[in-house]
């Protein structure tokens, strides 16, 4: 969220499910002077994304099981020209995830495997 603000995003919603992480997230936003753009919201992304839609970009560091649970909601929340930039998925899960995402209506763009981790850029088909 902070990186998005530094790169010029005027409005960033940082969704955090873990109540204990909210204070740290807000401190990091303040420490990086990003509070005008970044708003930390406590809650479930599956519930909040439809309320925030339409969005141009979704950034998420997310494990594969949560990604699959949120996939349809993320797709519905994006503008037709939007992108989801994802990291935090195990490289060993790359192929089955690719298959599930493509079957779920996503086009997979840039990808990167670094050590044990896979990241990718998705867009609606």
Model-derived regions, located:
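Residue-level signal for inorganic ion chemistry
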Residues: 25, 63, 101
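ADP-ribose/adenylate-binding Rossmann-like module
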Residues: 81-94
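A short SAM/SAH-binding and catalytic strip from SAM-dependent methyltransferases
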Residues: 56-69, 88
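Short alpha-helix immediately C-terminal to the canonical SAM-binding loop
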Residues: 22-23, 67, 94
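Core SAM-dependent methyltransferase catalytic element
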Residues: 106-125
